[in-house]
Amino acid sequence: MAKYEKSMTGQFETVINRLHEDIMNSGLSMNMVDESNYAIGDTNIAVRVYDKYFMRNGSRASLSLTVVGHGNDIFVSAIGAGGGQGIVFNFSLGAESNMVAVVEESINRMG
């Protein structure tokens, strides 16, 4: 499992759209599995689940992305999981970390 969290300022829709675009452009086998959106008052919550096939270890890894916005305050949580091979030992060869790194790099480019 790999995890990245960041608090930042920005426009909620801009952040979620940019993250989605960067995640989807990170690999041909990237797939958005599902999404959920919720708003109450000035607070918006978006949850996205992605998965990607990794040829190097013959498995899929998932990325759970949660973005919470309240006004211009944004909180992003990205958790990568799966991607491992084996029953007893879970050798992922960094698949989860690669997916989380896409989110971190995207946020860094946003400033």
Per-segment meaning from a language model:
Residues 18, 22-25, 29, 64, ...:
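Conserved mixed alpha/beta catalytic, RNA-binding, or beta-rich assembly cores of soluble enzyme
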Residues 4-8, 46-52, 67:
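Short beta-strand element of the conserved SAM-dependent methyltransferase core
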Residues 95-111:
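Well-ordered alpha/beta subsegment
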Residues 1-27:
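Terminal, regulation- and interaction-focused segments at domain boundaries
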